[in-house]
Amino acid sequence: MISLQETKIAVQNLNFYYEDFHALKNINLRIAKNKVTAFIGPSGCGKSTLLRSFNRMFELYPNQKATGEINLDGENLLTTKMDISLIRAKVGMVFQKPTPFPMSIYDNIAFGVRLFEKLSKEKMNERVEWALTKAALWNEVKDKLHKSGDSLSGGQQQRLCIARGIAIKPSVLLLDEPCSALDPISTMKIEELITELKQDYTVVIVTHNMQQATRCSDYTAFMYLGELVEFGQTQQIFDRPKIQRTEDYIRGKMG
């Protein structure tokens, strides 16, 4: 369905283990460039495990292992000699709960940039404004950049985390249930932002909210018990699923 030319991430025969527990089983999947792909499925199905394998977050924890291939622009991230910090710069991540750093709004954005680039003060100011503008936050914080990131509302904090992620100019942005802790208005702003971000980034989102998947995503992957059950364009998955288990899940017949 997605050609090689359209592919940003190609997953081949991916298996993942938590010690002896086989959490992901022979996953094969292509993630399209400059599109939003949603992972859906019941709790414990493996969708967050799959998402976090894309930038090797699992290496922060003991006794976790991935085998197979996760090719980003043709390079296998599981075997590459690329520095792990560079991988996580290329494949940025925003977590379920907003996690601003204990520093100013300005430094929340500038911190990661300083790790990879030496910018003049003027250029750094431009980058901070650019990232906050991209995250639809600049107009709300431009007069209080010196204030702590913790001083913002939950929805603003999550947009700050998105701005922090895109400030280092990744090619992929991973969002792990980014709206689950937010109120409906903040959720709407994040969803609008996700739709806009695909102009510049490949976006992958894990969500329990199937309505959110239909609103935000171009492609949807349904997972169950560590297996990829069905993958396709979002409208097709929700309107005309080909697999009975997919239909049962989206119609609420299974948890």
Swiss-Prot record:
Keywords, alphabetical: ATP-binding, Cell inner membrane, Cell membrane, Membrane, Nucleotide-binding, Phosphate transport, Translocase, Transport
Similarity remark: Belongs to the ABC transporter superfamily. Phosphate importer (TC 3.A.1.7) family.
Catalytic activity: phosphate(out) + ATP + H2O = ADP + 2 phosphate(in) + H(+)
Annotated protein name in UniProt: Phosphate import ATP-binding protein PstB
Record-annotated ABC transporter domain positions: 9-250
Gene3D superfamilies: P-loop containing nucleotide triphosphate hydrolases (3.40.50.300)
Subunit structure: The complex is composed of two ATP-binding proteins (PstB), two transmembrane proteins (PstC and PstA) and a solute-binding protein (PstS).
Function: Part of the ABC transporter complex PstSACB involved in phosphate import. Responsible for energy coupling to the transport system.
PROSITE patterns: ABC_TRANSPORTER_1 (PS00211), ABC_TRANSPORTER_2 (PS50893), PSTB (PS51238)
GO terms, molecular function: ATP binding; ATP hydrolysis activity; ATPase-coupled phosphate ion transmembrane transporter activity
E.C. code: 7.3.2.1
The organism's place on the tree of life at top rank: Bacteria
Location(s) in or outside the cell: Cell inner membrane
The UniProt record lists the keyword DNA damage: no
GO cellular component: plasma membrane
A Pfam family assignment: ABC_tran
GO BP annotations, alphabetical order: phosphate ion transmembrane transport
Source species of the chain: Haemophilus influenzae (strain 86-028NP)
Membrane topology, as annotated: Peripheral membrane protein
Positions that bind ATP: G41, P42, S43, G44, C45, G46, K47, S48
